[in-house]
Swiss-Prot record:
Its main location: membrane. It comes from Actinobacillus pleuropneumoniae serotype 5b (strain L20). GO terms for biological process: proteolysis. This is Protease HtpX. It holds the Pfam family Peptidase_M48. Zn(2+) binds at H144, H148, E223. It is a multi-pass membrane protein. Its EC number is 3.4.24.-.
């Protein structure tokens, strides 16, 4: 299963890309082009933040569907009761409303937190995590997710993504307008619509990749903060033990999401595109607290 924090980003990019095309049509119909930089900026802000906000408010339901999880309404067994009690206790310690809780069936040792606000959040853990970790280790993982919620990481990621979206749309629009503009033999301003669309779409894709790299850097930074938050709630030794456990189990594929859903376990890939820092760096940071 490979679909968590970057699921938020992919959804956001898809929505922003579609909205960017809609924006192109609006500009063509209204005649707003490169001569109205202010108008382009305003429209870019509106459409840029629309993509990230839609992704944010869809994040909880998308996360549940993507892993086939159901919210625990009433604990039915020891594992559910333990998770319920742990989340309840830690959310009280962190001074946040108790999140919804879910367990999903997966061999991956993983957990994630998501939701639009602290009042509408979710903590979900895999059966693989519950089966392969001690209660102390699992407690630290849950605390890590609670820290994400307490830190407001989903909202913060949304604001960052909105700014990035705005620049992606704005810069693509400005450059594509300049590249497609010219003058006819009479000196009248002209624009090659085909060139405009090709350049604009290509630039949105290129700038979108750069924006994703920035978002991934920010996600890695927030992971360190969530680790520190877990250490405050349950002690750094438990969090270190949980990360060391992850080093000895099969790591799942890189999560392709804020949705931030912010999962505990990111896979190894080139660090620029990693949503999580390497485990050894996280352990070192905890030891230095």
């Amino acid at each position: 299963m490979a679909k968590r924090i970057v699921l938020f980003l992919l959804t956001n990019l898809a929505i922003t890309f579609v909205l960017g095309i809609v924006l192109n049509i609006i500009f063509q119909v209204t005649g707003i082009q490169g001569g109205s930089t202010g108008g382009i900026l305003v429209m870019s802000l509106v459409f840029g933040f629309a993509g990230s906000l839609i992704s944010l408010f869809m994040s909880k339901s998308m996360a549940l569907r993507s892993v086939g999880a159901e919210v625990i309404q009433q604990p039915r067994n020891h594992a559910e009761q333990w998770l319920f009690d742990t989340v309840q206790r830690q959310s009280q310690q962190a001074n946040i409303p108790m999140p919804d809780i879910a367990i999903y069936h997966s061999a991956d040792v993983n957990a994630f937190a998501t939701g639009a606000t602290k009042n509408n959040s979710l903590v979900a853990v895999s059966t693989g995590l519950l089966d392969n970790m001690t209660e102390d280790e699992a407690e630290a993982v849950v605390a890590h997710e609670i820290a994400h919620i307490a830190n407001g990481d989903m909202v913060t990621m949304t604001l960052l993504q909105g700014v990035l979206n705005t620049f992606v749309i704005f810069l693509s629009r400005i450059i594509s307008t300049a590249a497609s503009s010219g003058k006819d033999e009479n000196g009248n301003a002209t624009q090659n619509t085909l060139v405009f669309w090709i350049v604009d779409i290509a630039l949105q894709m290129i700038f979108g990749v750069i924006a994703t790299m920035i978002a991934m850097w920010f996600s890695r930074y927030r992971e360190y903060r969530a680790d520190a938050g877990s250490a405050q709630l349950v002690g750094k030794e438990k969090m270190i033990a949980a990360l060391q456990r992850l080093q000895h189990v099969h790591e799942p594929q890189e999560m392709q999401g804020s949705l931030a859903a912010f999962m505990i376990n990111g896979a190894r890939s080139k660090e620029l595109f990693m949503s999580h820092p390497p485990l050894e760096k996280r352990i070192e940071a905890l030891r230095n607290l």
